[in-house]
Amino acid sequence: MEKKNKIAVLILILIVIVGLIYIWPMLNTQIPIDTATLGDTDTGTVVKNVYGNASAKNTIALITGIHPRETLSIDPEIKAAKEYVRDHPDVKIIHYDVRVTKDPEDYENGRYNGEHLVQDYVNDDVASSDADCVIISHSHIESYGEGFYVATPAMDSASVEISEKIQKTSDFNYYPKTGNETYKSTSAQLVSIPIAQSGHPTFVYEIPEDISEWDSTNKAKELFDMMVEFACN
């Protein structure tokens, strides 16, 4: 009987350990400290989440979902944001979660709807925020850009200076606007340029689509590290 009791106790301990292995990551992930719906229309929704310590001295703004087909730059990077603030109590991340519900799989319409949701509901909000920098997340096919990179469509001095530091100290590339071309990107005209003009260093962040979700999450954390070092006060 005593042997059976010991076996039962061991089994119970194993069950508890296995349960903790699955439950602990959920318990140990920082939940939003503040959530607000900024927009809810027939084209989609925009929800503002603030992750981390409200009094943190460093603030990063992250915009995901502007182009709904670029899924590798959405949920994996949201995961990165939550995990990052959990491990960095001096940082908070303002996350603008854009979810296009009308024609999300249509290349032209999905992009149009996402860009206008950001223009209508994110631009003014992030402009009035305490964000030290703004990251606009995208992913790209192999022929569009090279690897992981940041771009600065507004070519404002703050964004350019930070991007040059990122390029010099990491394996991230930097694609500046040369000044010889007319920038025709609608997302730049509607979103990244106006936000940069509001005084916030703004970065179009591009990742390749031939990577894993794990890679996407970890590279986003690397970028957050560099933003804290180079952009945050």
Regions found by a protein language model. Give the residues of each.
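Structured catalytic-domain cores with a bias toward divalent-metal coordination
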Residues: E2-N233
